[in-house]
Amino acid sequence: MDIPRGNRYRPRKMGDINMHSAFENEHIHGARRFVSEHQFFVGELPQRVTVRLYQSLDRDWIEFEQSHFINTPLQIDAYRTSTPFGDDEDDALHLAVGFCLVQWYQQAVAEGHQPDESWLVPNPRFHNFVERPCSVRS
């Protein structure tokens, strides 16, 4: 059977194992694998921020998602990067934390603005994966 050419998943070798052959289909695109989750506070802001990293399965980069964007008094709107990915995990995490959040916070504080919880704007596309309580049988 011939598979039509086009935009389709091309598996990457991770070690000696071909990853995710289930995605080898012309109708599948944008496949990614969860890598890690990081939670932290920015300066004096009371909300916990979460950053998740994903390995793209058809591109050579690490994607990131943020639970919040930052919108200080120095900005017209909350900063949303147009390139939410890095070359590797370290690069992606530095971009998500340092460039997309902390630099804006530091600049506003340096210019005399008092941190306010309204500076962190929830990302409506970020899903919280809440753990369901487990019942314990005795």
Label each region the model flagged.
Residues 2-48, 116-117, 127-138:
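Negatively charged, low-complexity tracts enriched in Asp/Glu with abundant Ser/Thr
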Residues 34-68:
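Amphipathic, interaction-prone secondary-structure segments
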Residues 46-48, 77-79, 120:
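Short, mixed charged/polar active-site loops
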Residues 67-95:
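A short, exposed loop/beta-hairpin motif centered on an aromatic-Gly-Thr core
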Residues 98-115:
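Short arginine-rich
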